UniProtKB/Swiss-Prot annotation:
Family to which this protein belongs: Belongs to the YbaB/EbfC family.
GO MF entries: DNA binding
Alphabetically ordered keywords of this record: Cytoplasm, DNA-binding
PANTHER family: NUCLEOID-ASSOCIATED PROTEIN YBAB
InterPro entries: YbaB-like_sf, YbaB/EbfC
Protein name from the UniProt record: Nucleoid-associated protein SPy_1862/M5005_Spy1580
Alphabetized Gene3D superfamilies for the sequence: Nucleoid-associated protein YbaB-like domain (3.30.1310.10)
Oligomer and partners: Homodimer.
Any one GO CC term of the record: cytosol
Free-text function comment from the UniProt entry: Binds to DNA and alters its conformation. May be involved in regulation of gene expression, nucleoid organization and DNA protection.
SUPFAM superfamilies: YbaB-like
Highest taxon of source: Bacteria
Pfam family, one: YbaB_DNA_bd
Length: 99
């Protein structure tokens, strides 16, 4: 069985690795798309909105509801990508804890 000092060293090492992975993830960008890519929403890995792009075809003053729906779809798509990448990137640390 590991002694306490070794466990602490391993925990500190894992913490540094996890912090680096979190920083790497925050630096990444994720772009979510609506149907037909008419609306795109880009976020950083720490879920900060970088931009939203609307194609001309979706901008219709008579149909704001479609624009709203597609914007929501693009945002949710990007956030899902972030969550999946976060789970893949940081989930590996759960099995490495020394206790």
């Amino acid at each position: 069985m590991m002694n306490m000092q070794n466990m602490m060293k391993q925990a500190q090492k894992l913490q540094k690795q996890m912090e680096q992975k979190q920083a790497d993830l925050a630096a990444m960008q994720f772009t979510g798309k609506s149907a037909q890519d008419l609306v795109t929403a880009t976020f950083t890995g720490d879920k900060k909105l970088v931009g939203i792009d609307f194609k001309e075809a979706v901008v219709d003053p008579e149909d704001v509801e479609t624009l709203q729906d597609m914007t929501t779809q693009a945002i949710n798509d990007a956030l899902t990508q972030i969550d999946e990448t976060t789970k893949k990137t940081l989930g590996a640390f759960a099995g490495k804890l020394p206790f």
